[in-house]
Amino acid sequence: MSKSEAEYRQDIIDVGKLIYQKGWVAANDGNISFRLDANRILCTCTGISKGMMKPDDLIVCDLDGNKIEGSRERTSEIAMHLTIYQMRPDVRSVAHAHPPVATGFAVAGRPLTLALLPEVIIGLGCVPLADYGLPGTPALTAGMLPYIPKYDAILMRNHGLVCYGEDVYQAFFKMETVEHFARITLVAELLGGPKVLPKEEVGKLFDSRTRYGVKSRTPMEPGRPVVAEDVEQCKERLELTRDELIALVDEALRLRGVLT
């Protein structure tokens, strides 16, 4: 059953509060939108905390970003939302924020593409990293274009995370999944490095999508993650004896003036 516009507005307000309470945005960060119909987008305004919005603060604009309704100014990153809607007819909501751990990976230039968690593989595949683009300009979206058709969550280099889905809550839950995945990945790295699932197991997880009601556009989509076999192919094993290792360390220390 379809909701009223007032209910969709309240969904954005409620999710705005959630991302603020979780610490995924600070001050006026972030933006959320919802596709009302074929010609109208409901979106957050600029210059306001996403945890302190009211329904009347939201803006209605057309598919060119022109304001149709609202007393405030629409988000400066509306072009990113519109591009996603244009490229993905199945998407009805887009959420952008700066969840700290996921954004830390983006700042470090690290995509979240390893096949580690069944829930992430089934629901998202993996999370790629888009090239940096100046916020509020077309360059922001340019680096995302190769990923939008295949992925439902994209890390934005030195910026944050964008997620999208069939409604506001689905976009929010995907963002929550990515941040949770980033935290687990970070802990695994601190504990000696994550153990990546092999291709066969990842294939089984992709095959199980239908059972869990996850939509997939093509086999092994969205976003095939990096499997154990990929990692092994990238490894270059270096073997040293104890004496060779000591000599190598001594040489490095002498070059830095630590030893004479």
Task: Describe the predicted segments one by one.
Residues 1-260:
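Glycine-rich flexible loops
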